[in-house]
UniProtKB/Swiss-Prot annotation:
Family designation: Belongs to the universal ribosomal protein uL14 family.
Protein's recorded name: Large ribosomal subunit protein uL14
Keyword flag rRNA-binding: yes
Gene Ontology biological process terms in this record: translation
Record organism: Limosilactobacillus reuteri (strain DSM 20016)
């Protein structure tokens, strides 16, 4: 589960390495986020020469969580880390590469570009 003040690793090459969650989008009473949720975050660590800088406020989509997710076929998947991919306002990724596996649940949303860039979809 992702909530306010959670720190997530960034799974793309946009220049950010770690982000801190400011808000989970999707209504006024949303307290926690899971895979596929869009968040507003600030960049806490960044690599030099990247697209985004430290302190920038960005939008991101959660692609991996330690908490995991239940699937309709009865299986359960969880990851070793919490990670997100930075996105633009049109839900396209800011980076050109995605690192690490992502969950299949992103396929049904508006994130097919992220799914196609990912090296592994679980």
């Amino acid at each position: 589960m992702i909530q306010q003040e959670s720190r997530l690793k960034v799974a793309d090459n946009s220049g950010a390495r770690e982000i801190l969650v400011i808000k989970i989008l999707g209504g006024s009473r949303v307290k926690t986020g899971n895979i596929g949720d869009i968040i507003v975050a600030t960049v806490k660590q960044a690599t030099p020469g990247g697209v985004v800088k430290k302190g920038d406020v960005v939008k991101a989509v959660v692609v991996r969580t330690k908490h995991g997710i239940h699937r309709k076929d009865g299986s359960y998947i969880k990851f070793d880390e919490n990670a997100a991919v930075l996105i633009n306002n049109d839900k396209s990724p800011k980076g050109t590469r995605i690192f690490g596996p992502i969950a299949r649940e992103l396929r049904g949303d508006d994130f097919m570009k992220i799914v196609s860039l990912a090296p592994e979809v679980l």
